[in-house]
């Protein structure tokens, strides 16, 4: 007789969301979407939350919901982004106006201050992936050079002291997303390609930090770096209080992406994100300089 394979029904991993900062701008939507799935009988293994606004996770209504989920057996895993560019003037545009690439994001210092509380909410620093993402370099409207690379090195040092082990980075370069190229042309700011010498420097410095601090720094979808998994089913299994299994299937939704299966609840088209990062490939609400 032919063998029959039994389909395993794993609990799901929910991603909220790669496409928009739901905790900051759409917390009620986030709560509703999770509750709807639970009411429909879906079992949630882990809720992976992505945000540049860690303080939003401590908003009373959202916090109460997250604590309830955690107490019900849903693992909380946080992807926290700190690039060093939050609400920071990093140069000038073509009209000589101060340029903030992340105009409505919190400062690096604000985010670092709140991290111990997020670690407490997660239950362990291993349930946080710190994203120094992206790294960019530009010549601004005054032809002055800027990169946030050194800020990212400093961020890893500071976060490692809190016990955070996993880090992700990407590189913003011209020619990857037409929307991003168009935005920077509008601003009169030149995105610069990362030449091989700079890439080699990044690799060397990150390797040195890994050895010094005992951390792991992974590239997110960058040619020439090993494939990595921002959502890593095996890690989520190992970190889950009950060690329950989850799908390890890799959909490969983007080239060089090693993420395992998850359901992203950000919706399509993506929700408008008022954080307004100039390098965003999704649907940012760009900052207007008319009132500056």
Segments the model singles out, each with a brief description of its role:
Residues 1-7:
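Short, compositionally biased "basic patch" segments
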Residues 7-191:
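Conserved AdoMet/S-adenosylmethionine-binding subsite of the radical SAM
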Residues 125, 149-169, 233-261:
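Structural recognition of alpha->loop->beta junctions
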Residues 132, 169-173, 215-229, 269, ...:
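Acidic carboxylate-rich catalytic motifs and surrounding loops in phosphoryl-/glycosyl-chemistry enzymes
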Residues 196-258:
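A C-terminal junction/extension of Radical SAM enzymes
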Residues 263-264, 268-285:
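Local cysteine-cluster metal-coordination motifs and their immediate loop/turn environment
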Residues 285-292:
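Short cysteine/histidine-rich zinc-coordinating motifs and their immediately flanking basic loops
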């Amino acid at each position: 007789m032919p063998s029959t394979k039994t389909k395993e029904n794993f609990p799901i991993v929910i991603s909220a969301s790669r496409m928009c900062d739901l905790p900051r701008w759409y917390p009620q939507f986030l709560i509703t979407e999770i509750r709807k799935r639970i009411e429909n009988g879906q079992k949630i293994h882990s809720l992976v939350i992505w945000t540049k606004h860690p303080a939003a996770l401590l908003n009373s209504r959202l916090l109460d919901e997250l604590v309830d989920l955690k107490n019900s057996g849903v693992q909380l895993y946080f992807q926290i982004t700190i690039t060093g560019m939050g609400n920071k003037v990093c140069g000038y545009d073509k009209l000589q106006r101060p340029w903030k690439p992340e105009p409505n994001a919190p400062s690096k210092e604000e985010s670092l201050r709140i991290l111990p509380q997020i670690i407490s909410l997660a239950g362990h620093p291993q349930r946080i992936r710190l994203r120094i993402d992206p790294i960019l370099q530009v010549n601004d409207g005054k032809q002055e050079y800027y990169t946030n690379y050194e800020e990212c090195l400093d961020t890893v040092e500071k976060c490692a002291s809190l016990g955070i082990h996993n880090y992700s980075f990407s590189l913003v370069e011209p020619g990857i997303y037409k929307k991003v190229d168009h935005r920077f042309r509008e601003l009169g700011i030149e995105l610069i390609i990362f030449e091989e010498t700079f890439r080699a420097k990044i690799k060397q410095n990150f390797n040195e930090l890994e050895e010094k601090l005992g951390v792991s720094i992974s590239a997110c979808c960058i040619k020439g770096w090993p494939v990595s998994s921002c959502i890593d089913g095996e890690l989520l299994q190992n970190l889950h209080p009950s060690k329950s299994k989850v799908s390890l299937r890799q959909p490969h939704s983007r080239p060089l992406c090693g993420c395992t299966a998850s359901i992203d609840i950000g919706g399509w088209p993506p929700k408008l994100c008022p954080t307004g990062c100039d390098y965003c490939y999704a649907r940012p609400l760009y900052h207007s300089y008319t009132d500056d």
